[in-house]
Amino acid sequence: RFVDNALTIQQLVEEAWEKTCGKAVQTVLHVQIADRINETRTVRCRCDCLTKAEIREREIAEYDAARLRERRRRECFRVTDPKKQELAGNMEKWTFANDDRKRPDLSDAMQRYVEQFQEHRRESRGLLLYGDVGTGKTYLAACIANAVIDQGHTARMTNFASIGNELQQTWEKQEYIDELCKYDLLIIDDLGTERKSEYMQEIVFNVIDARYRAGGPLIITTNLTTDELSKPGEIGYSRIYDRILERCLAVKGDGQSRRRQAAIKGWEKMRQQLGMEVHAH
């Protein structure tokens, strides 16, 4: 008897038997191949018991993975304000599949960002979604968060009002910020709507600066205009926005993207990767 190219089977030994059905599930073949004597190959046999066990094992693994994704999703949109619990629950369902695609160019670009997330994560490249109220910036940011969670990553979506409240409730402020920066993707929603005070400005800077230094992509949504971002009027906010614009591609909420001239160069390549047109500032 021969196997493949004149492989002479010398012995059939060491069969392993399935205890339930009594069928062989593994056979070790000692074969002679050219000048190699007694080379061992293991041939796996199939039986219904083994197949059922493997299916069950796969089902358990898929169930555990689904539970992990849902746990990460709840953590991503977690809020401490009881009035916002319902909104947080809804955000878990904000996905590209449910997108109304009123801005198809922008939706497609955001999906490409997710598809290329490994590269953008490695290069610490994020997005600054800016534009008028109601243009879907928060929705698309949540879509990105849900999509990267489905890929197996961690994400956290929050805002500086919530961060400020949570920091007031802990003595370990730096530890809190460090934990915030450990997520694979950090999303800050509604930048600029937090109350204006020296204390809050310090919080905003500390979080942005910590993420900047730690690396990893940052996504920001804001109603601020590019003029307000480039000329904030306060030195404190100027250094904050400079860090954001160094690491985040500015994308207008209506689907058109723009690049601040003073920001880091080289965004053209990323625009091409996302399939977006290049516009002059």
Predicted regions and their residues:
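A short, basic N-terminal segment
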Residues: 1-105, 261-281
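Short glycine-rich substrate-engagement loop in P-loop NTPases that contacts/grips substrate
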Residues: 102-111, 145-185, 195-202
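Pre-Walker A adenine-sensing motif
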Residues: 109-121
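Walker A/P-loop nucleotide-binding motif
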Residues: 121-141
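Short loop/turn elements that form and flank the Walker-type P-loop nucleotide-binding site
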Residues: 122-123, 151, 180-183, 211-215
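Residue-level preference for the first positions of well-ordered beta-strands
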Residues: 124-128, 155, 185, 217
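Structural recognition of the conserved hydrophobic beta-strand(s) that form the central parallel beta-sheet
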Residues: 157, 187-189, 217-223
